[in-house]
């Protein structure tokens, strides 16, 4: 059952998002996973651009089954249900970077904050991770029914607990810039940019924006495979299949699929 404070927060959020072409808002004080709830909503027929968010998420997850830690009130978990249009079906693998671009553009448009996207889709601020993204698919038999876009954004101080041995140290927008962003303001700015950028998906303009946002471009990085072996190379860009383009020390051009390697700074 929702508490009064939860009802008030949901009302405030709906007011903040009024006028946006979204399919509805679901807010929780505490939830296991916004993506898991997104699956349930999608299975029940929730419309395109339905938004799920919470004050606290207790069972969040990231790519490669990694645990995503959400500190209550400081990190904002959110899921958006996407019902892809016919022309978007061939570009489903681009919705994850689209989400990263929407985060980047929201920070820039709303607060003048410049961030980068670490291939394939983490958002970095001062080379520290402030947003992670997990895009999942709901299948009905062999038919794709909907996309579940999940993201966790570290907004306020305390959102990134100190964890040893992280490849990319986590941080928050407030810690890196001193700027305090309210949850309703953040959600509105993000959704505005997601709506604005969505028609660009798969177009030359989409790839241009992604390249412009790419972290470590023209820099030497370490590319680590799942088995632990690694090599170095210079990041050159992204091809039309979403692959990372790298030149190795021998001068050979190599491309890598998302999930095939992990990118780490030297």
What does each of the following model-derived ranges do?
Residues 1-6, 21, 85-90, 94-115, ...:
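Long, positively charged amphipathic alpha-helical accessory segments at protein N-termini or as interdomain linkers
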């Amino acid at each position: 059952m929702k508490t009064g404070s939860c009802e008030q927060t949901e009302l405030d959020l709906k007011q903040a998002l009024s006028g946006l072409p979204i399919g509805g808002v679901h807010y929780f004080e505490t939830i296991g996973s916004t993506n898991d709830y997104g699956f349930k909503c999608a299975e029940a027929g929730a419309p395109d651009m339905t938004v799920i968010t919470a004050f606290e998420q207790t069972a969040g997850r990231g790519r490669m089954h990694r645990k995503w830690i959400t500190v209550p009130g400081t990190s904002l978990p959110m899921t958006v249900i996407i019902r892809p249009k016919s022309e978007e079906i061939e570009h489903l693998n681009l919705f994850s970077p689209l989400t990263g671009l929407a985060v980047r553009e929201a920070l820039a448009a709303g607060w003048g904050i410049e961030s980068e996207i670490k291939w394939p889709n983490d958002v970095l601020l001062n080379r520290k991770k402030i947003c992670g993204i997990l895009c999942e698919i709901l299948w009905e038999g062999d038919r794709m029914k909907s996309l579940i876009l999940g993201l966790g954004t570290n907004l306020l101080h305390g959102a990134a607990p100190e964890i040893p041995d992280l490849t990319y140290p986590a941080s928050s927008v407030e810690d890196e810039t001193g700027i305090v962003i309210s949850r309703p303001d953040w959600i509105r700015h993000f959704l505005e940019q997601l709506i604005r950028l969505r028609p660009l998906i798969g177009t030359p303009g989409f790839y241009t924006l992604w390249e412009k946002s790419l972290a470590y471009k023209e820099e030497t990085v370490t590319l680590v495979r799942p088995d632990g072996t690694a090599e170095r190379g210079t990041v050159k860009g992204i091809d039309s299949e979403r692959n990372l383009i790298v030149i190795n020390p021998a001068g050979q051009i190599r491309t890598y699929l998302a999930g095939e390697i992990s990118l780490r700074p030297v």
